[in-house]
C-alpha cells in the first residue's frame, strides 16, 4: 500500500498574480523561474489515474510550501490525508483507521510534489527540461528527472492564459496520472493549514 504514497506525490492553475512575461515567453530557459516567487500553493484538483486500461478519478485539495511541507486531502472514495512536516511523511487512512509515518528521505525529491515543495535551485538539480512547445494555445513543458533511480519517468506541465492548469506524469508503475487544478492560489496561508488532525481511534505506525 505504500505505493499509494508515490501515486499522490504527484501532485499539484495557479493564482491571480502571475507575471505576464512568463505567460508570453515561457520556455526551456525560464520554466523554473516561473515558480521563483511562488512560495505557497493552495488548490483543488481532480486526479485521473490510468493503468492497464482502467481509469480511476478522485478529487482533492493540496497545500504546499517551498520548505518541504505539504498536505494533500483525497476525498471519496479514497478518504486519505498525506502530508509532510519537512522531515517525515504522514499518511492517514480513515478506512484502515491507521496513520503511517515514514522518513522523508531524499528519493521523495524526485516525485512530482517537489515541483511545489523544492526551491528553484533544487528543481534545476533534480530535473532536466526536455521541451516547451505550444500546442493549441497551451504551452506544454516536458521535464525528466536527472536521477536514474527515480520512479518518475516523465512529467508534463501545461500552461494556458498565464497560468499552470495541469500536471501529468508517467511512472515506473505503468501509471499515467493527470492532475487538473482549479481555484488555485499562490497566496500565503497559516502553518496551521498544514496540520493533520488525528482521530482518537487511529493507530500510528512508524516505519
What are these regions (language model features)?
Residues 27-30, 34-86:
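N-terminal mature ectodomain segment of secretory-pathway/periplasmic proteins
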Residues 1-3:
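Short, Lys/Arg-enriched N-terminal segments with co-localized hydrophobic residues
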Residues 122-128, 133-207:
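Gly/Pro-enriched, hydrophobic low-complexity segments
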Residues 43-45, 70-74, 89-92, 143, ...:
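Short hydrophobic/aromatic-rich beta-strand segments that constitute the beta-sheet cores
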Residues 61-111, 177-178:
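An acidic-aromatic
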Residues 97-139:
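Flexible, surface-exposed loop/linker segments and immediately adjacent secondary-structure boundaries
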Residues 5-17:
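Sec-dependent N-terminal signal peptides
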Residues 19-24:
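Sec/Tat signal peptide C-region and signal peptidase I cleavage site
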Amino acid at each position: 500500500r505504500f505505493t499509494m504514497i508515490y501515486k499522490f506525490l504527484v501532485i499539484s492553475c495557479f493564482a491571480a498574480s502571475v507575471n505576464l512575461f512568463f505567460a508570453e515567453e515561457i520556455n526551456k530557459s525560464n520554466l523554473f523561474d516561473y515558480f521563483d516567487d511562488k512560495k505557497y500553493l493552495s488548490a483543488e484538483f481532480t486526479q485521473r489515474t490510468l493503468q492497464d486500461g482502467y481509469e480511476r478519478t478522485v478529487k482533492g485539495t493540496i497545500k504546499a510550501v517551498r520548505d518541504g511541507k505539504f498536505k494533500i486531502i483525497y476525498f471519496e472514495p479514497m478518504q486519505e490525508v498525506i502530508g509532510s512536516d519537512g522531515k517525515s511523511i504522514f499518511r492517514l487512512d480513515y478506512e484502515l483507521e491507521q496513520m503511517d509515518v515514514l522518513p522523508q528521505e531524499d528519493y521523495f525529491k524526485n516525485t512530482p510534489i517537489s515541483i511545489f515543495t523544492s526551491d528553484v535551485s533544487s528543481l534545476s538539480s533534480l530535473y532536466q527540461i526536455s521541451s516547451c512547445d505550444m500546442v493549441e494555445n497551451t504551452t506544454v513543458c516536458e521535464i525528466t528527472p536527472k536521477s536514474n533511480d527515480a520512479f518518475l519517468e516523465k512529467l508534463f506541465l501545461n500552461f494556458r492564459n498565464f497560468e499552470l492548469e495541469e500536471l501529468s506524469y508517467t511512472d515506473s508503475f505503468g501509471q499515467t496520472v493527470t492532475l487538473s487544478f482549479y481555484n488555485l492560489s499562490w497566496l500565503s496561508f497559516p502553518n496551521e493549514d498544514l496540520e493533520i488532525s488525528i482521530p482518537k481511534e487511529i493507530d500510528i505506525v512508524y516505519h
